[in-house]
């Protein structure tokens, strides 16, 4: 019985044959297949159908957090009964530990962990250990070191009503699982004790588990809202998984401490023999402090650097990653594989180079080198069956694939966009005229440039000309980037200018024009693959058009234009043959940040005070600044447990965004 797909439409266009061929390939035992799908042909829908028919745990790898968020939201809609989870880096801000010998500069690791994303990571790993109908959408974080799935799964605590359980012993078990006791600031990964009642917020949950004792007997287990205390569900049994992925047994911890001490002694001898006395002293001081922390509390800052000892692995042995939480027969999709595959290849070398310097200068033991991402060869060994998904598959996918399935026809009958090449002379004025024509028709525009400076200058110029413009650049964090793209769709902005951020996987049906500046400058950003991907951003609109500003036609431009024309002719012939009239895509604007940034599910009965009321006469730029300021205040209020204030601020933000979206 296939898993249930929920969608207001059935597979059409090229989708049915793509699903049929790829499923047949999987059942025939093909290890490598490629879905060559043009932009807007519904590749995500096809992936959901394949998952539903194959009925195996599935990993969808994507190359950035924005795309992961988008895919996760779509799969959750298509597969309401399945466990659709997300696994990305939980750092909002991250500066890795590093040492620059030329400046004698040590950079300490600084990280700001996003609690909500950490919760989603735990939800993903726990789903994999408890059920089969699991689809995880992940970034390359999937190949970075994670705690052992065996320890994570075996160390869980089973609680059942009616069983006799020594409460004090249970509290010690929770502490062993890295839970913290906190009777005041009750949050995820903590527990509190009140009389005969024990409350726990598991690492994967937003709700609390209350365990009520009668003496040493568990009398009742309920799930409740930690803020209001409202009982949501009654349970006969629950399982509490560790609060952190890096967890180990007491026996393994003791063995690890002995092993770390032995490695330290050996390394100190090496450094002293080489006359590196400063490095030896530094390493000794840092490692002994960590060992003391491990002995006393079972945890230390940077514990992941000792993961080889904690896991009992041999030097150089493959580390545990998210891939090890999957069963052997799992299915993998690699979305936008032409970008994701090279990214997977490059992870190991960059990490190794940075850590080798730390080891050489006595900041870390050599075993820290084994806290690393997978080498590409190790990643390949984890693959049971994989489907590469891309509009422009790379040489690796083409060479490996036993079958390449084309998906060119769109269900809506939409054609690939028309392409026009225009001279660079007077390009900005020409572009401004095109933008104004699109704005009159309530359409959106993407503009891609080659340099950050040019993108900034162009965005500033367009703003001066009265165009609602936003500049999308690499310094913008994940959540804000998602919000900018959402606001483009809502009409807060009419134009978004970017460099390399307007390519793979951006689903923006309102965009009718993509302008490519300096299209004839050969290079990575203007290769045939990049150009085809950029062109695809205009393929979801019935009036989709691409303007390349160039003075010559490069080979990459020629290939991209020819391939787009080939697909366009196939699509036109299909439409004529079946009497299809192209239709625009009507797609709701999902709030991809709904579970990553929120204070409460429902709007509360909160009153906005006159001092904080929304000003209606501010210029648009000032309102956008105000929204940012209010969001900061909302976060601070939520952190300080001032939930009424946080919810009131949230309501103001919603009102401001609605006002911006409606105003012209």
Swiss-Prot record:
GO cellular component: cytoplasm; excinuclease repair complex
Domain Helicase ATP-binding residues, every copy: 24-182
Residues that, per the record, bind ATP: 37-44
Secretion signal, residue range per the UniProt entry: none
Subcellular location: Cytoplasm
Keyword Cell membrane: no
A Pfam family per the record: UvrB
GO biological process, any: nucleotide-excision repair
All copies of domain UVR, residue ranges: 624-659
SMART domains hit by this protein: DEXDc, HELICc
InterPro entries per record: Helicase/UvrB_N, Helicase_ATP-bd, Helicase_C-like, P-loop_NTPase, UVR_dom, UVR_dom_sf, UvrB, UvrB_inter
Statement: the UniProt record of this protein carries the keyword DNA-binding: no
Residues covered by the Helicase C-terminal domain: 427-593
Coiled-coil intervals: none
GO molecular function: ATP binding; ATP hydrolysis activity; DNA binding; excinuclease ABC activity; helicase activity
Short motif (Beta-hairpin): ranges: 90-113
UniProtKB keywords: ATP-binding, Cytoplasm, DNA damage, DNA excision, DNA repair, Excision nuclease, Helicase, Hydrolase, Nucleotide-binding, SOS response
Function: The UvrABC repair system catalyzes the recognition and processing of DNA lesions. A damage recognition complex composed of 2 UvrA and 2 UvrB subunits scans DNA for abnormalities. Upon binding of the UvrA(2)B(2) complex to a putative damaged site, the DNA wraps around one UvrB monomer. DNA wrap is dependent on ATP binding by UvrB and probably causes local melting of the DNA helix, facilitating insertion of UvrB beta-hairpin between the DNA strands. Then UvrB probes one DNA strand for the presence of a lesion.
Subunit description: Forms a heterotetramer with UvrA during the search for lesions. Interacts with UvrC in an incision complex.
Domain text: The beta-hairpin motif is involved in DNA binding.
Family, as annotated: Belongs to the UvrB family.
Name used for this protein in its record: UvrABC system protein B
UniProt lineage: Bacteria, Bacillati, Chloroflexota, Chloroflexia, Chloroflexales
